[in-house]
Design a protein with these regions (language model features):
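Short, amphipathic alpha-helical segments
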Residues: 69, 104, 129-132, 136, ...
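Conserved Class I SAM-dependent methyltransferase catalytic core
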Residues: 11, 16, 20, 133-165
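Hydrophobic alpha-helix-in-membranes signature
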Residues: 109-110, 156
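Class I SAM-dependent transferase core
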Residues: 1-34
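Conserved SAM/SAH cofactor-binding pocket of Class I
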Residues: 26-108, 114-119
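Mobile active-site "lid"/loop adjacent to the S-adenosyl-L-methionine
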Residues: 110-137, 141-145
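Conserved donor sugar-nucleotide recognition element shared by glycan-biosynthetic enzymes
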Residues: 20, 24, 46, 71, ...
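Residues that recognize and position ribonucleotide moieties
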Residues: 4, 106, 154
Length: 165
């Protein structure tokens, strides 16, 4: 599959469960990153959201984490090929286990299927279903990792947003 091309960068997405999609691109374009110096993308996948934020902001550090090894490797390769490679970092780890600094902006296009048929592909199940990251676990991670004046931006379908709030 061909790379997804933006004006200043491209995103390779072969070998990952979730390809570049509308939800991630919308979140990357919509999130207010005007004052963020440290940014965390939970469930980075290909790294598209982190890349868009690195392009749009003056952030000193943008970290993308993903529990899936193939996704973290893909994001790392996309980060290395970008003009912001010195700002971006990909880490293979779950949101529940990730520790360290506090972030001014945390973003997530989380898995949101709760009560639906699981995919036969375990990578796709992890990327799409809340089996590895529930909304409660996401909340706890955000509260633990966000700076006192930080912001949290996420994108969910309407029916899941009602459940999330």
């Amino acid at each position: 599959m061909a790379a997804f091309r933006f004006k200043r960068f491209a995103v390779e997405h072969d070998g990952v469960a979730m390809k570049v999609g509308t939800d991630g691109v919308l979140l990357g374009a919509w999130a207010d990153c005007s004052t963020a110096k440290r940014v965390l993308d939970i469930g980075t996948g290909t790294g598209v959201i982190a890349l868009m934020i690195a392009q749009r902001s003056d952030a000193e550090r943008v970290v993308g984490i993903d529990i899936d090894a193939a996704a973290a490797e893909c994001a790392a390769a996309n980060f290395a090929a970008s003009p912001w490679s010195d700002t971006l970092e990909a880490v293979q780890i779950s949101a529940q286990e990730f520790t360290g600094e506090k972030f001014d902006l945390i973003l997530s296009n989380p898995p949101y299927f709760v009560d639906s048929l699981l995919c036969p592909d375990s990578q796709r199940t992890t990327a799409r279903h809340t089996t590895e990251l529930t909304f409660e676990q996401l909340d706890k991670a955000v509260c633990r990792l966000m700076s006192s004046n930080g912001k949290f931006a996420l994108i969910l379908p309407t029916e899941q947003m009602e459940r999330y709030i």
